[in-house]
Amino acid sequence: MAAPSSRPESNPPLYKQALDFALDVANGRHALSKLIPPALFLVDALLCGLIIWKVPYTEIDWAAYMEQVSQILSGERDYTKVRGGTGPLVYPAAHVYIYTGLYHLTDEGRNILLAQQLFAGLYMVTLAVVMGCYWQAKAPPYLFPLLTLSKRLHSIFVLRCFNDCFAVLFLWLAIFFFQRRNWQAGALLYTLGLGVKMTLLLSLPAVGIVLFLGSGSFVTTLQLVATMGLVQILIGVPFLAHYPTEYLSRAFELSRQFFFKWTVNWRFVGEEIFLSKGFALTLLALHVLVLGIFITTRWIKPARKSLVQLISPVLLAGKPPLTVPEHRAAARDVTPRYIMTTILSANAVGLLFARSLHYQFYAYVAWSTPFLLWRAGLHPVLVYLLWAVHEWAWNVFPSTPASSAVVVGVLGVTVAGVWFGAREEWEPGMKSSSKKEEAAMR
């Protein structure tokens, strides 16, 4: 009987091999995947230089910042009397210190080119930190191009020199150190960012939960919170010592009036509704409600107790909410991905229900959206599509009803998607799928 002939296995078509190779690199399954972040970083550095060279600088707030610093250097300590061309000083004291340094470095603000170069460096440092956070959270490499492609984000940093750039850097540095379980450094950096701009208050509930669950000790958590409060006091001492009420009312003003002509997010509701007190209260109520849903059903899950069970021992018996073994078990579930998902989702919830977003607020959106859309479980094509639509909406000037509806819509999809799609990140018993996914990527 003749032996069956053995045919050599044919190789897959060349296009199939190329596609498999590209998918392996994009999903982190190839050694070349590690080259994607540094390659994109270098390209973006060149792009920043090209923008400074070719695109005219846009004056918005820089001159006002310099005028305000000049008044403070002249001895003014009453925040209600410090004004610039675009209005009063409404930022905490860390903003003043940073722009005082820039005031001296840039010849009292006159050397705009040097200021742009400094902000380009600030952008690159922030981008490096963001990439480090993404890598630590095991985000797939195909997300990284989205970190470098935003026209609006480059404009915020390199062409407009907003103080949001520093606040965003401190926020990402805090996430970076939290992921490495350096709670003291992370808490310090976060509160410094809050000292630049109070927009970082949006992520404060999540930061508090991350510190509580991750530090492994209720006492340590209280110490960290006390340190953050003390830093805020020390930052404001030159102003608190003379005009405390004026400083607090301006630097952390929560009742500020917003102009309909500048809104990026709520133009589609019309000016009458936008300016109404009922609309403001509705947004506040929705913000609190959705935050409560995330806290009770997602963020505190590593504690393996309900919110009532956590609070009751503290209020009724003065005892820590978790025993030492319980706290250690919870801390093990506070992974780099949990930290990033929790803090960025809190930020997204706050931005979704914000009374009014201006164009510079995209600095808090641009680098978080790709990660959150991925955590929502969306297909990469949908991630790129939603990112592109959102980017378009933030580049429409002035905003239109259509563009503002897109801004709110994508934020809504992001928040809802994370709540539904990333639930395993907060469920102690559902992490096996995440670990398998990470193993497949690396």
From Swiss-Prot:
Segments in the Cytoplasmic topological domain: 56-84, 133-155, 220, 294-333, 398-401
Pfam families associated with the record: ALG3
Pathway: Protein modification; protein glycosylation
InterPro entries membership: Glycosyltransferase_ALG3 (IPR007873)
Cysteines joined through disulfide linkages: none
GO molecular function, one term: dol-P-Man:Man(5)GlcNAc(2)-PP-Dol alpha-1,3-mannosyltransferase activity
Superkingdom of origin: Eukaryota
Transmembrane spans: 35-55, 85-105, 112-132, 156-176, 199-219, 221-241, 273-293, 334-354, 377-397, 402-422
GO biological process, alphabetically ordered: dolichol-linked oligosaccharide biosynthetic process; protein glycosylation
Main subcellular localisation: endoplasmic reticulum
Swiss-Prot/TrEMBL keywords: Endoplasmic reticulum, Glycosyltransferase, Membrane, Transferase, Transmembrane, Transmembrane helix
Positions in the Lumenal compartment: 1-34, 106-111, 177-198, 242-272, 355-376, 423-442
Cellular location(s): Endoplasmic reticulum membrane
Catalytic activity: an alpha-D-Man-(1->2)-alpha-D-Man-(1->2)-alpha-D-Man-(1->3)-[alpha-D-Man-(1->6)]-beta-D-Man-(1->4)-beta-D-GlcNAc-(1->4)-alpha-D-GlcNAc-diphospho-di-trans,poly-cis-dolichol + a di-trans,poly-cis-dolichyl beta-D-mannosyl phosphate = an alpha-D-Man-(1->2)-alpha-D-Man-(1->2)-alpha-D-Man-(1->3)-[alpha-D-Man-(1->3)-alpha-D-Man-(1->6)]-beta-D-Man-(1->4)-beta-D-GlcNAc-(1->4)-alpha-D-GlcNAc-diphospho-di-trans,poly-cis-dolichol + a di-trans,poly-cis-dolichyl phosphate + H(+)
EC number(s) from the headed UniProt entry: 2.4.1.258
Membrane topology: Multi-pass membrane protein
GO cellular component: endoplasmic reticulum; endoplasmic reticulum membrane
EC top class, as a word: transferase
Biological role: Dol-P-Man:Man(5)GlcNAc(2)-PP-Dol alpha-1,3-mannosyltransferase that operates in the biosynthetic pathway of dolichol-linked oligosaccharides, the glycan precursors employed in protein asparagine (N)-glycosylation. The assembly of dolichol-linked oligosaccharides begins on the cytosolic side of the endoplasmic reticulum membrane and finishes in its lumen. The sequential addition of sugars to dolichol pyrophosphate produces dolichol-linked oligosaccharides containing fourteen sugars, including two GlcNAcs, nine mannoses and three glucoses.
PANTHER family linked to this entry: DOL-P-MAN:MAN(5)GLCNAC(2)-PP-DOL ALPHA-1,3-MANNOSYLTRANSFERASE, NOT56 - RELATED
Family: Belongs to the glycosyltransferase ALG3 family.
UniProt-recorded name of the protein: Dol-P-Man:Man(5)GlcNAc(2)-PP-Dol alpha-1,3-mannosyltransferase
The species this protein was found in: Neurospora crassa (strain ATCC 24698 / 74-OR23-1A / CBS 708.71 / DSM 1257 / FGSC 987)
